[in-house]
Amino acid sequence: MYSIVAEESGLLPRERLLQKGAEVLSDQELLAIVLRTGTRSESVLSMANRILKGMTSLADLSRLSLNELQKIPGIGRVKSIELKAMVELAKRIEKAELARSEQIMSSQQVARRMMLDIGDKPQEHLVAIYLDTQNRIIQQKTVFIGGVRRSIAEPREILHYACHLMATSLIVVHNHPSGEAYPSRNDIDFTQKIKRSCDDLGICLLDHLIVGKSTYYSFREEREDFEL
């Protein structure tokens, strides 16, 4: 293993973190700490710099598969696993921050949360978020994952859990694996169906959101009075 060689002009990234805090470190320095070591011919700082230059933004790291990470020169099996674990942990931390004693105040708030959660899934996922009288989350549940024979859940599957949890309202969210968030005719029909079923049971359907990797569509925001 080959460790980073310090430049005479400055401290090593780990030393800078200890003395000045993680927030002052550059992306290159933080990535170098995660990578830990370079190769015989390249320091870990140079490797980190090369990796970052090959990306449009840090967000690209979250989109690379293990195989794609291993194709980067200097990134073997172990480093690719460590990077993937770091990215997943960062996602979970952000989701945990969003969920902490969270009261749902807007569709945008939910969309931000769900873009992280299911926005980049290769299959369609339908999630129901069940809320109490104060719009606090009781439970978030993946109700359906798309398959060959079915592409959307039935209202009864969603409402079964709503009744069990004694939820007073709910939000339905699903992703489009294509990344586009505009509703199809099936999406509109499904929304009409779930809204009628909720009304029949006295449960408020606050919204149906469609999310992609970086965009979303809200039936409540886009359709006046949520009338479909």
UniProtKB/Swiss-Prot annotation:
Keywords: Hydrolase, Metal-binding, Metalloprotease, Protease, Zinc. Zn(2+) binds at H174, H176, D187. Belongs to the UPF0758 family. It comes from Streptococcus thermophilus (strain ATCC BAA-491 / LMD-9). PANTHER family: DNA REPAIR PROTEIN RADC, UPF0758 PROTEIN YEES-RELATED. The keyword Kinase does not apply. One of its GO terms (biological process) is proteolysis. This is UPF0758 protein STER_1430. The keyword Cell wall biogenesis/degradation does not apply. One of its GO terms (molecular function) is metallopeptidase activity.
